[in-house]
Regions:
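Alpha-helical coupling/stalk and coiled-coil linker elements that connect catalytic or binding modules
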Residues: 1-424, 431-460, 483-484
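ATPase nucleotide-binding head domains, primarily ABC-like/P-loop NTPase cores
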Residues: 68, 369, 376-593
């Protein structure tokens, strides 16, 4: 159903694009016909002194100007339509699995010192970040990366994001529009340095410059009017014109330096202005989203200030024409006025500009988190439990990075203690742990989770799942795992809630040492403030419950049909009674019948 919605949006957008292309062709044809006709009418009318032809030429000139303006507007709409198609394709990629080839995977945000980043596929190829990311700006991407944490931080902010994301889920078309407008920005756009420049205050010398510009521009205007209409001498306006032009040339290096930010982001200013207007008109009236958008309305309204700044940027850009530079500066000291007005704008709205850009960065995070609800039929907002002991309850939980139609939902009802999971190779043990861990990360970010219900006590997630040798550091797989488990034990001394996920504990050593070490590690990690999940092929660990340790057992099964091994990937209570390693060895041709 959700996929069908985005397919319909894509089809409608393709029809719109086709219509716009036809309109573009008509505009090009009309301009091609009108311009020479206008030129011919004006020239011929002037030659033969025919007022009617001159009027026709004037009408065609006006028509040509209108056609150019409409054509430019259509080109902007065509670019936005292309962005719509790209965004819609991104949503559809989440249903087909093609999202795993998207370039922005957040690999740079993953840290080796944070094992969950790799173990739970938070960053990197085929990761939570890659699936979610709707951010175009650098600030938005950094905020999203910071939100995807295995450690609960500010639950008040998490709940606020949940409420804001819930509001976005009601408006999927608005989400597409916002993403499409954001997609027009340069990839990885970073505006922090620019925001700092915009916030610089007006200097006292610029106040003097502003006064100079007003005085001498007024003097030239009055002298010109006096010479033109009162019979005065043209020497004075000519002198003032040359004087003003000389002043403008003298100030040119400083003018260039002061107006440089406008030149760098003239296009971005227009794009941000359209984004802010879309946000102001958006039907997002909830308290949480109102708090996010508040900086757009106070102390300075973003759209009003941005519109003025865009106009100023366009005025500053006109200086690049040499003829305009000479005429405008000789008559009006154009450069000085632009510089002074820009400085005044910075005083009035410069400090607020950084806040506007932060609003968009936060909206990009919310659009990213809403991706789960837009693309998964089964999803829910998690409930955070305020309980003294850790608890995690989930129904129909699936991993986000596996297609929903192929993922097998599983339940979890976990409290303080240890769950030992046994099962054959490829039966789903590791995926089950990752499902719980990754959904916990989504919960802390403020996103919906892939489950029909999900409730948990806020707890730090510690993992030991995907371990490899560190040749440069001289650390073996076994020793790397020891270091991770040591960190778990050190953190456990704080008495804070923990979710501990260990896959195939101590796999890097011989079976005798592994069993002894695993039994001791499980004893020390079975705590009243921790939920510990351990997968293993060592059935001896299933007997810890008989020794008074609060350990429960669960398992995954397989069954055989002819020469095929099949899994249902459903977790069951109790210990596993089957193995499949020898069967897999025979299937691979390594072991004979």
């Amino acid at each position: 159903m959700k996929k069908q919605f985005y397919e319909n949006v894509r089809e409608n957008t393709i029809v719109l694009e086709r219509t716009q292309n036809n309109q573009r062709t008509r505009f090009i044809l009309a301009r091609t016909v009108v311009f020479p006709a206008m030129f011919a009418a004006l020239i011929h009318g002037y030659d033969v002194d025919a007022p009617a032809e001159m009027m026709l030429g004037g009408f065609l000139l006006l028509l040509f100007v209108v056609l150019v303006a409409r054509h430019r507007k259509l080109e902007r709409l065509r670019l936005l339509t292309k962005a719509y198609l790209a965004v819609t394709a991104g949503y559809l990629a989440r249903f087909t699995g093609e999202w795993k080839s998207l370039p922005e995977d957040g690999a740079g945000y993953g840290k080796e010192k944070r094992p969950p980043d790799r173990d739970l596929h938070i960053f990197g190829a085929a990761s939570l970040y890659q699936y979610l990311c709707a951010a175009r700006t650098q600030a938005g991407r950094e905020r999203l990366a910071a939100a995807l944490t295995a450690t609960p931080r500010d639950l008040a902010r998490t709940r606020q994001r949940q409420a804001a994301v819930a509001e976005l889920l009601v408006h999927p078309l608005l989400c597409i529009e916002l993403e499409a407008r954001g997609a027009r920005l340069p990839d990885g756009h970073d505006t922090r340095a620019l925001a700092k420049e915009l916030a610089q205050p007006l200097s006292s010398s610029l106040k003097v410059i502003s006064c100079i510009g007003i005085v001498f521009a007024s003097a030239f205007a009055l002298s010109f009017l006096w010479a033109a209409f009162a019979g005065g001498s043209w020497i004075l306006p000519l002198f003032l014109f040359m004087f003003n032009l000389t002043v403008a040339i003298a100030f040119y290096p400083r003018t260039q330096r002061e107006l440089a930010p406008l030149g760098r982001m003239a296009r971005e200013l227009r794009l941000y202005g359209r984004i802010f207007r879309t946000l102001e008109r958006a039907p997002l009236r909830g308290e949480a989203f109102a708090a996010v958008l508040a900086p757009l309305f106070a102390p300075v309204r973003a759209t009003t200030a941005q519109s003025r700044l865009t106009t100023l940027a366009e005025c500053a850009a006109m200086r690049r024409n040499v003829l305009f530079f000479m005429l405008a500066n000789g008559a009006l000291l154009w450069d000085l006025h632009c510089m002074a007005y820009f400085s005044h704008w910075r005083v009035q709205a410069g400090t607020a500009a950084a806040g506007w850009l932060k609003v968009w960065a936060e909206v990009e995070v919310l659009l990213s988190l809403a991706r789960v609800g837009h693309t998964r039929a089964v999803h829910t907002f998690p409930q955070f439990l305020d309980e003294a002991v850790p608890r995690l309850d989930a129904q129909e939980a699936t991993p986000l990075v596996i297609a929903e139609e192929t993922a097998t939902p599983n339940d979890a009802h976990l409290a303080a203690g240890t769950l030992v999971i046994t099962g054959s190779n490829m039966s789903g043990k590791t995926t089950y742990m990752r499902t719980l861990g990754s959904n916990t990360v989504l919960a802390y970010a403020g996103a919906p989770v892939c489950a029909s219900s999900f409730a948990l006590t806020p707890m730090a997630v510690y993992t030991s799942i995907q371990i490899s040798d560190d040749l440069a550091g001289g650390i073996s797989t076994f020793y790397a795992e020891l270091l991770r488990i040591k960190k778990m034990m050190e953190y456990s001394k704080r008495g804070k809630p923990m979710l501990i996920l260990i896959d195939e504990i101590f796999r890097g050593t011989n079976s005798a040492d592994r069993i002894v070490g695993a039994r001791e590690a499980i004893r020390r990690l079975t705590l009243p403030h921790a939920i510990t999940i351990v997968t293993t092929h060592d059935f001896e660990l299933c007997d810890l419950g008989r020794e008074g340790v609060p350990v429960a057992n669960a398992h995954f099964e397989e069954h055989y049909e002819g020469d095929k091994i099949l899994f249902d990937f459903k977790i069951r209570t109790g210990r596993c009674r089957t193995t499949n390693a020898q069967y897999l060895l025979r299937m691979a041709g390594i072991m004979g019948d």
